[in-house]
Regions:
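Catalytic cores of peptidoglycan-degrading enzymes
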Residues: 8-134
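Alpha-helical oligomerization segments with coiled-coil/rod-like character
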Residues: 1-5
Length: 134
């Protein structure tokens, strides 16, 4: 039975192709940062976005350049961010379990096409998501 408590390990937030890695990059669209603080995973509009681990939704709405965004506090020092969604399936305060669908992929905010901007923060520091994915 799924639980919203963190398992201590992450799953991939969606299926797709990595189009931008964490770290320095050339801005893909005007206004985009040249230091990328996340992993971009591209697929088609509407592709399911899943919670990387159990936790509590702390943001579900418009978040500037990330467009429609979800943030989940996993309660163990980790916060994950899922940006550029076309629609959101969760609300602030909601408990979610690892693998629960939380959004649908889109291209909202500053974006060049449909993808999931997947960010990981550990104890307040932005870190490379690839270091925490299987």
């Amino acid at each position: 039975r799924p639980t919203w408590f963190p398992t201590g390990s992450f799953r991939w937030p969606c299926y797709g192709v990595i189009t931008s890695f964490f770290g320095p990059r050339r801005a893909s669209v005007p206004g985009a940062s040249t230091y990328h603080e996340a992993l971009d995973i591209a697929n088609s509009y509407g592709t399911a976005i899943y919670a990387a681990d159990g936790g509590t939704v702390t943001l579900a709405g418009w978040y500037g350049g990330l467009g429609y965004c979800v943030k989940i506090n996993h309660g163990n020092g980790f916060v994950t961010t899922y940006g550029h969604n076309s629609s959101l399936l969760v609300s602030v305060g909601q408990h979610v379990y690892k693998g629960q669908q939380i959004a649908r992929m889109g291209s909202t905010g500053i974006s060049s096409g449909p993808h999931c901007h997947f960010g990981v923060t550990r104890n307040g520091t932005i870190v490379d998501p690839l270091n925490y994915l299987p």
